[in-house]
């Protein structure tokens, strides 16, 4: 390691530290501008809590919780799996580009994007969907049609008529809290196991409070994004100050 050589910018035979600092500063400024544009486009710049969201956070300790079997609140969907070695045989350039999911924990489980024949496409209506991979307990949310890597049925595809992005995030949090401590590679979260797994959800008279879950997640998102927005604002202000001085 001590004899390894690395390439660095130089000037007059000396490492050009000033150039490196300026280069990194410019890259950071570009990313901050992109972040600001993204926050504006998605409406995430507004991190002010509504009264309903404040109430959801303040009243969390007083909310009643009940344990539900996953099978009682989410529906298992039939799935079409693909052998990765046969992707070329399934290509159809007339189809739209959709994500191809595996069981990896990186990139949200997406291996690639492909145009394949309609017969192997899952979730054609683009419904809110939760994937749970039994080998590593990885949990993924999606709301697009998708392709699924052959895992011998190791992936559970879950939906519900009441499921949307916000309450799905709450469901996933509750599910992961249980399965990450209960299952492992040697004790897999199989479909039979998952169906009978109990998760804790806010409820009233035995019915999950879907609306409360949505408001609660929205409030938590705003609390998190507030720090991101304030960080971006500070960086943008600092960049403008440097530009003004120069």
Q: Predicted segment positions?
A:
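Compact, glycine/acidic-enriched structural inserts
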Residues: 6-11, 184-185, 204
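Residues within well-ordered beta-strands of beta-sheet-rich folds
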Residues: 5-7, 26, 198-200
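DNA target-recognition domains and sequence-specific DNA-contacting regions of bacterial/archaeal
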Residues: 1-3, 71-198
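Non-catalytic DNA-recognition/assembly elements of restriction-modification systems
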Residues: 11-109, 205-246
């Amino acid at each position: 390691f001590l004899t390894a050589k690395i390439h660095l910018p130089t000037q007059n035979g000396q490492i050009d530290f000033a150039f490196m600092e300026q280069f990194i500063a410019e890259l950071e400024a570009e990313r901050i501008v992109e972040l600001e544009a993204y926050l504006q486009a998605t409406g995430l710049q507004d991190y002010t809590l509504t009264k309903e969201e404040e109430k959801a956070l303040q009243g969390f300790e007083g909310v009643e919780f009940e344990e539900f079997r996953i099978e009682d609140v989410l529906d298992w969907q039939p799935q079409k799996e693909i052998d990765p070695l046969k992707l070329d045989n399934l290509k159809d350039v007339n189809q739209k580009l959709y994500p191809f999911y595996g069981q990896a924990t990186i990139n949200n489980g997406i291996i690639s994007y492909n145009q394949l024949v309609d017969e192997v496409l899952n979730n054609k209506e683009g419904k809110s969907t939760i994937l749970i991979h039994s080998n590593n307990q990885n949990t993924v949310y999606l709301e697009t049609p998708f392709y699924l890597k052959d895992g011998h049925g190791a992936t559970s595809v879950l939906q519900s008529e009441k499921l949307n992005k916000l309450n799905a995030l709450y469901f996933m949090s509750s599910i992961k809290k249980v399965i990450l401590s209960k299952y492992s590679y040697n004790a897999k979260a199989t479909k039979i196991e998952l169906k009978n797994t109990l998760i804790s959800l806010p409820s009233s008279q035995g019915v999950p409070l879907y609306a409360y879950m949505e408001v609660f997640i929205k409030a938590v998102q705003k609390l998190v994004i507030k720090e991101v927005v304030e960080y971006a604002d500070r960086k943008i202000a600092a960049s403008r100050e440097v530009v003004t001085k120069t």
